[in-house]
Design a protein with these regions (language model features):
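An acidic/polar, Gly/Ser/Thr-rich interaction patch typically located in mid-to-C-terminal regions
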Residues: 17-42, 47, 182-324
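A generic structural signal for beta-strand entry/edge sites
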Residues: 29-31, 74-79, 156-160, 310-314
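Short beta-strand-centered interaction patches in the first periplasmic/extracellular domains
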Residues: 121-193
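Extended Gly/Ser/Thr-rich low-complexity repeat segments
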Residues: 44-56, 91-100, 283-288
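Assembly/oligomerization scaffold segments
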Residues: 1-89
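Short acidic/polar beta-strand-loop edge motifs in secreted extracellular
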Residues: 86-108, 118-143, 147, 168, ...
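Short solvent-exposed strand/turn elements
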Residues: 78-94, 311-324
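Short, compositionally biased
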Residues: 69-77, 134, 165-167, 298-310
Length: 324
């Protein structure tokens, strides 16, 4: 194991009794929580500061660049919480754009926070008018990604936007074998999915219907928070900003994105086993389950939790959503 603090490996100089790294494919920044035995108050003497850079590596696992967000000395212990998102990402702003493009906005937001921007399959849509009103840059961009059937994540100093359908069409990165030595739980909530979505935003409206839909329920969401199924291990979106649209075509496109956001977590699972450092969020794996073969097939990993001190990993995954 290696723990870098502002570029220096301090692992052998500290007594680490808790180390959990959580990686997310969407809607939540990666977190790293470290707790040290510190009966002599050494950490406070080192004067750690918000924004300091940490990085933890173990085997094939690498947190990438993480920024210190909070610290807490308590009863001979010292706890640090770091995130992949820079501290500046919590700043609320207000701004408007005319004729801005999707990739232009991604590059602008990344630059605002000292990040670089990378795109994986997202269409460079144009927005005649876009408004940010007392919210963070990443909240705005995450909403826009969701409406376009995309998602964003931050890793190692990079803001990444990816089309979910594009990623789901790639080859699997490896195999996840669920055997008798691991604990697994699968959930089938597809009966709660929707057959179509209608978006009405001001004077514009649009509809999208899922191909070969087995459900007839219609989703009429006014915000992101109204277009989601609860996913194990993933916090529910609290985004209640009322949707805006510039045309009927844009409203129909947003309806497609919202329907995907609501339906993609209809079939989920999670698997825990001794530390599995070779797995990361936002990857495709081939699932093989010895005692539940009906669930076998390609899955999308939307969260990975590594407990390095407890020697345990938990992977959260969902089925691929076909057709949209």
């Amino acid at each position: 194991m290696k723990l870098f603090y502002n570029g220096t490996d301090i692992y052998n100089d500290v007594s680490l009794n808790y180390c959990v790294h959580e990686m997310y494919a969407e809607k939540q920044a990666d977190t790293l929580v470290l707790r040290f035995n510190d009966t002599k108050g050494i950490w406070s003497k080192w004067n750690p500061a918000d924004g300091d850079v940490l990085r933890f590596t173990e085997g094939a696992s690498d947190t990438g660049k993480m920024f210190l967000h909070s610290m807490k000395p308590e009863n001979g212990l010292f706890t640090i919480r770091a995130m992949a998102m820079p501290k500046s990402g919590a700043t609320r702003k207000s701004k408007s754009w005319a004729g801005v493009r999707f990739l232009q906005l991604g590059n602008e937001i990344a630059a605002n926070h000292g990040l670089t921007f990378q795109n994986y399959g997202c269409t460079d849509q144009v927005y005649p008018y876009l408004r940010q009103e007392s919210e963070t840059d990443f909240a705005l961009f995450s909403r826009l990604c969701t409406l376009e059937g995309c998602q964003m994540l931050i890793y190692d100093g990079k803001l990444l936007a990816y089309s979910e359908q594009y990623i789901e069409q790639q080859a699997v990165a490896g195999t996840l074998e669920v055997d008798e030595n691991g604990n697994f739980t699968y959930q089938d909530n597809r009966s709660a999915c929707f057959g179509s979505c209608e978006v009405t935003a001001g004077s514009f409206s649009g509809t999208f219907s899922a191909p070969d839909a087995k459900n007839t329920a219609v989703l009429r969401a006014k915000c992101i928070a109204e277009a989601q199924l609860r996913a194990p291990g993933l916090p529910a979106s609290g985004d209640r900003v009322v949707l805006m649209s510039n045309s009927n075509a844009e409203a129909a496109r947003f309806a497609k994105g919202l329907l995907r956001n609501a339906n993609k977590y209809g079939h989920t699972g999670q698997f825990s086993k001794a530390l599995l450092t070779g797995y990361a969020a936002a990857s495709l794996l081939q699932l093989k389950t010895e005692k539940a073969s009906a669930w076998n097939g390609p899955v999308f990993v939307y969260k990975v939790r590594h407990d390095f001190v407890g020697n345990k990993s938990t992977l959260y995954f969902r089925d691929l959503l076909e057709g949209y």
